[in-house]
């Protein structure tokens, strides 16, 4: 049994898969979770290729199935005796202009991106408090720091996660438990490719935003391949063990540039630049 135990959500692809392999390579025991075990093939292949199979346990967990989280944490503790790191990675991006999104679509976005992270965090906090140590890495986004057209549901869920993480950090840091935010920019993770993650009204040619929705999709496709997602996995492994972790870690050239523009430019100038760059003018 390894001394360091990590629980990671959303491990069938993207940051979850890559961080599972990276942490296991560095000696961690990893409980890698996903909501559909039939999609574990890519993770199993990556783990096998890296030669870290003995350090990875793949388990069923739906981040949006909140009533199951306490029992899941209890089982992990029964099996391993401790939880040193929780990576709340599971999430998705609900696309669509605010005018087209329904309240149910907003709720659907929040169930995983926000309430899922809160529920799992609550499930592991008692063990971390008892240990007087632990890290909770919440995978946020640059979208949690500045609004993005056609992404208001995603923005809102990540802004909520940022505020929650700040408050939790102030509450838990004095006892040795450190919530940490990682804020990626545009990385290739597959998060944008699911049709169910787009507002139903976005497919309606009669939507007042039909043309602009098409322009936004084109923009997203052009910016997806900017950076290697392994950089985020390496950052997760770094903050898992660095002695004094920061509150926030923006990552990606575009994330840092957007943050700088948002902080330095007057709102009207920033607004004009974003609308023009994304081709969202009427």
Residue ranges with predicted function:
Residues 173-223:
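C-terminal beta-strand-loop-alpha-helix "lid" module of Rossmann-like NAD(P)-dependent dehydrogenases
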Residues 12-14:
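Conserved glycine-rich cofactor-binding loop
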Residues 60-71, 103:
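The beta1-alpha1 cofactor-binding region of Rossmann-like NAD(H)/NADP(H)-dependent oxidoreductases
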Residues 141:
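Residue(s) in the substrate-gating loop at a strand-loop-helix junction
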Residues 99, 146-152:
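Active-site loop immediately N-terminal to the catalytic Tyr-X3-Lys motif
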Residues 97-98, 105-107:
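Substrate-binding pocket helix/loop in short-chain dehydrogenase/reductase
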Residues 121, 157:
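Active-site helix of classical SDR
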